[in-house]
Amino acid sequence: MIHLIASDIDGTLLQGGQTRLDPALFDVIERLEQHGIRFAAASGRQYTNLRRLFAPVADKIDYICENGSLVISDGSVLYKR
């Protein structure tokens, strides 16, 4: 069973200079949550930048940010370097 889906942002969910995520992605994240599957945004970007980018679902996803030096789940820091 799948418990977590993680995705890179730049060059994957955002392509060709896009600055906003496709709103359909937020619906997908909501549906994943309904099935007990977590979504994690993985990026070199800073945490605050990712929260703004994922604003509609910001409190429902996990973050692997700052090139892996900060990991946050359910608002708690799991790893910081």
Descriptions of predicted regions:
Residues 1-2, 8, 60, 66:
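A structure-centric signal for secondary-structure junctions around beta-strands
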Residues 2-18:
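Asp-based phosphoryl-transfer active-site loop
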Residues 18-19, 51:
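Conserved strand-to-helix beginnings and helix N-cap segments that scaffold or border functional pockets
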Residues 21-23:
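A short acidic/small-residue loop/turn micro-motif
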Residues 25-81:
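Active-site phosphate-binding/coordination module
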